[in-house]
Amino acid sequence: MSYPQEVNKRRTFAIISHPDAGKTTITEKVLLYGNAIQTAGSVKGKGSSQHAKSDWMEMEKQRGISITTSVMQFPYNNCLVNLLDTPGHEDFSEDTYRTLTAVDSCLMVIDSAKGVEERTIKLMEVTRLRDTPILTFMNKLDRDIRDPMELLDEVESILKIRCAPITWPIGCGKLFKGVYHLAKDEMYLYKSGQGSTIQEIQIVKGLDNPELDVMVGDDLANQLREELELVQGASNEFDHQAFINGELTPVFFGTALGNFGVDHFLDGLTEWAPKPQARVADIRTVESAEQKFSGFVFKIQANMDPKHRDRVAFMRVVSGKYEKGMKLKHVRLGKEVVISDALIFMAGDRSQAEQAYAGDIIGLHNHGTIQIGDTFTQGENLKFIGIPNFAPELFRRIRLKDPLKQKQLLKGLIQLSEEGAVQVFRPLINNDLIVGAVGVLQFDVVVSRLKSEYNVEAIYETVNVATARWVECTDAKKFEEFKRKNEQNLALDGGDNLTYIAPTMVNLNLAIERYPDVVFFKTREH
């Protein structure tokens, strides 16, 4: 297959949702359709060893939530689909934001009993920054749901994106009978209790087909016809260009648990979602059709293989083709490196990548030299931009139970900060270690990983820090004066960048007023 054909058949997407909307279940079912796993493991099984395929870290296995981002590749409809799993529990980290910089489209999953929830709103704001095309799956139709028209209105008014229903539900809860496909004028009938296999779907052609009344009953059949008259009059038609621009979302209804409707959005994804897109770098825009290799690292994951203390850097291939043993330039370090052992992933199962194309995600073994945001090329000096680092909102001082393990603690924290799990600050005036996070769960994750991966027992104490900002100044003399007078509020982060740690917002605002030449940054590009 030629290079353009290889690139054009790739689809790289992530699933975004509020916790418990069914994202992990959908991930399972998607892999089932891609023949990647034989039976879909049910999440949160009581004492069962069947963990969902994408939740692979110890703490995730205990809690039944996906904390870290995994990558899964599978074939579907003559396409090669890369699914990036993002943490869905309510305390997610910047990892999630950064993963969204590595995809070309997203599937938004909504719990139809609840509608649009807070985390979905936050994640949609992130996709807006790049106008990412969005498909929508209204999940959990096997339960009692809100009125489908209401759900569409809510998405339109809160998320400011037009909805174009592609399928429409026939009943819900115990009366859920299937969906009607608006464009194909076909009904797909649902049978319960077949969630872990791909079921033979019974199809009824034509909305006026009397067979429909026999299959679902007169009441539901008439209700469906009435609803569809309204829907076809009041809702948007699917417009491919508006979808690509991120202005309109095709909406599918179904139940992930019952494994019904998942193939409908997969068909939509492979047919409509964009092939690998161009990416903006500091000096130019890089097109996916370019033959020379380029890619950027959007996440680092420590200890994916508990037997080896390894760290893997996940890289999105932007252009060109990776081949085993090729020589690449690590632009930030200005060094040529030979990459002979890159990995491709099938959620927890990894294998050596012989080759990879634009749109694919590969893993590089990282011995501490690769950072989030690093660019690799075939020699060109360019850096991909737009991979954010956020100022944390929560802070704790971390203390050892065994003071002799200070070295392991620092090593563990620096590694965890490099992979974006938390940020670490070392105040200039003492030997404290302050951990900053975007959400509370990250603190638990760090303590449990320090223990299981670095054999360090640590506890947290409160610390008088309200917020942090990275500081820079072009006037060296004024910067020195600023540093001298504010030493008690200055710290170095994991990458040795100078940071102002403020005990209160008032303190920060005063500092900003007093030192107009110093710039205080809330986010930092990697």
UniProtKB/Swiss-Prot annotation:
Biological-process GO terms, alphabetical: regulation of translational termination
Highest taxon in the source lineage: Bacteria
Keywords: Cytoplasm, GTP-binding, Nucleotide-binding, Protein biosynthesis
Binding of GTP, residues: 17-24, 85-89, 139-142
Signal peptide: none
GO molecular function: GTP binding; GTPase activity; guanosine tetraphosphate binding; translation release factor activity, codon nonspecific; translation release factor activity, codon specific
One cellular-component annotation, GO: cytosol
Gene3D superfamilies associated with the record: P-loop containing nucleotide triphosphate hydrolases (3.40.50.300), Peptide chain release factor 3, domain III (3.30.70.3280)
Cell compartments where the protein resides: Cytoplasm
Annotated tr-type G domain residues: 8-277
HAMAP family the record matches: Rel_fac_3
Family: Belongs to the TRAFAC class translation factor GTPase superfamily. Classic translation factor GTPase family. PrfC subfamily.
PANTHER family named in the record: PEPTIDE CHAIN RELEASE FACTOR RF3
Stated role: Increases the formation of ribosomal termination complexes and stimulates activities of RF-1 and RF-2. It binds guanine nucleotides and has strong preference for UGA stop codons. It may interact directly with the ribosome. The stimulation of RF-1 and RF-2 is significantly reduced by GTP and GDP, but not by GMP.
Designated name of the protein: Peptide chain release factor 3
